[in-house]
């Protein structure tokens, strides 16, 4: 009975212990923004991975508190998956922060452009040209 419980607990921990992470499109988008210097780094992925060696550290750092408690209880076994969890969670947090920042910047630029058009500071042709430039600046592809 104890062996079954231990195997079930280990299987549960191994299947749920890691953060889901980003899909390939999100990774490409974040890499694009990082290359252009537009990414926001709220969490350091290297630090998240390093803290994963401590009991539950990677999960707690990545704001996965439930998994952090489980990994704390399963330490030292959790050092096999918690560094990956901390790294992936940090990247996910950075992706969300970057998306929010980029969208705010884009909206601000478009609002300023709309105000110029409404105030007759620019004509429709100039508005269209500048709007296209704003869209290109804040689009990942």
Indicate residue ranges for each PLM-predicted region.
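Hydrophobic alpha-helical segments, especially transmembrane helices
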Residues: 3-5, 60, 132
């Amino acid at each position: 009975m104890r062996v079954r419980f231990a195997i079930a607990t280990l299987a549960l921990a191994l299947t749920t212990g890691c953060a889901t992470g980003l899909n390939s499109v999100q990774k490409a988008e974040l890499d694009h923004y990082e290359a252009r210097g537009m990414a926001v780094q709220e969490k350091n992925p290297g630090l998240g991975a390093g803290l994963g060696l401590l009991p539950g550290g990677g999960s707690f750092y990545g704001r996965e508190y439930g998994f952090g408690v489980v990994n704390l209880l399963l330490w030292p076994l959790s050092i096999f998956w918690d560094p990956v969890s901390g790294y992936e969670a940090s990247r996910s947090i950075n992706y969300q922060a970057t998306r929010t920042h980029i969208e705010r910047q884009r909206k601000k630029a478009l609002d300023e452009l709309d105000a110029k058009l409404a105030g007759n500071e620019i004509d429709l042709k100039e508005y269209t040209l500048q709007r296209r430039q704003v869209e290109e600046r804040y689009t990942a592809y």
